[in-house]
A protein has these predicted regions:
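Bacterial N-terminal signal peptides that target proteins for export
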Residues: 1-7
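C-terminal motif of bacterial Sec signal peptides marking the signal peptidase cleavage site
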Residues: 15-18
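N-terminal domain-onset segments
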Residues: 20-89, 159-257
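Extracytoplasmic c-type cytochrome modules immediately beyond a signal peptide or single-pass transmembrane anchor
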Residues: 47-48, 52-112, 116-120, 125-132, ...
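An exposed acidic His-Trp-rich patch
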Residues: 98-182
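Generic detector of short alpha-helix boundary/capping microenvironments
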Residues: 7-8, 82
């Protein structure tokens, strides 16, 4: 799809940013005191006076499902608010709901098949494909017309995502404690919890089954064999270690302790 057409869909999604939302509350209440009147006034002033261009660039809303890498039973709904950086790269912030009190669960970076093909195999092991999410009808773009959603999904089907969750509200955690977790997406029918899908479909007045039928004519690409590595028993997660005195530890360019 040409950039202009994709941009048109993005504008459509932005115009409907308030559509298909406000129907999913956060899974937890946050620990801490209620906002004082002073805090609310300061917050309101900041909202009016400060620049928020990075937030305003989040012009696409996608709702889908993730599971913990290595634990397919640990499944949850994920509300993605995304900015299309260019034709090949999209970045999303992920919430556990779509209301003002939703918790920021994590992030997902999405790249085209062209860019993904150039990544090292070990890097690819941390990424998941999107073919099944689209083909199953379980991935939706709430609030935009059906034709626009289908074109959105046609492009999305060939992409790959790298997702980290940092606040595990599905485990009833009131604070973002614990290690960040690498997440994956479903790759076959029967993997997703049917009750979870049905509950989401009811809230959004959609049907994953009907979505699947509507997307049957999408030309789904072959999946890179190094993606979805959990299917081959390659499971990657972070482990907390004390870097002090640890030789060979990867610090990503951070200053030495």
């Amino acid at each position: 799809m040409k950039y202009a057409s994709w941009l048109t869909l993005s504008v459509t999604a932005f115009a409907c940013a308030g559509c298909g939302g406000k129907n999913t509350e956060s899974a937890v209440e946050t620990s801490g005191a209620d906002k004082t009147a002073k805090t609310q006034v300061l917050e309101a002033g900041a909202a009016v006076m400060q620049n928020r261009e990075p937030l305003e660039a989040l012009n696409a809303y996608i709702d889908g499902f993730h599971f913990y890498n290595g634990n397919i039973k640990g499944q949850m709904e994920a509300h993605h608010y995304c900015a299309l950086l260019n034709e090949d790269v999209t970045q999303c912030v992920i919430y556990d709901g779509n209301t003002a009190h939703s918790k920021l669960m994590g992030v997902e970076y999405i790249v085209s098949a062209k860019l993904f093909a150039g990544l090292p195999a070990k890097e690819k092991h941390m990424w998941h494909s999107h073919v099944q999410e689209v083909r199953s009808g379980q991935l939706i773009a709430p609030g935009i017309p059906e034709f626009a959603e289908k074109e959105f999904m046609r492009k999305f089907a060939g992409t790959y995502g790298k997702t980290w969750h940092t606040w595990h509200t599905d485990q009833d955690k009131e604070l973002p404690v614990g290690s960040p977790m690498l997440m994956m997406g479903f790759t076959k029918d029967g993997q997703a919890d049917e009750a979870m899908i049905a509950a989401r479909d009811k809230r959004f007045d959609t049907s994953s089954a009907e979505n699947r039928e509507n997307r049957a004519d999408i030309d789904y690409p072959a999946i890179d064999p190094d993606a979805d590595a959990w299917q081959k028993g390659i499971v990657i997660q972070l482990r907390a270690i004390d870097l002090k005195g640890t030789e060979g530890a990867e610090t990503h360019g951070a200053p030495s302790p």
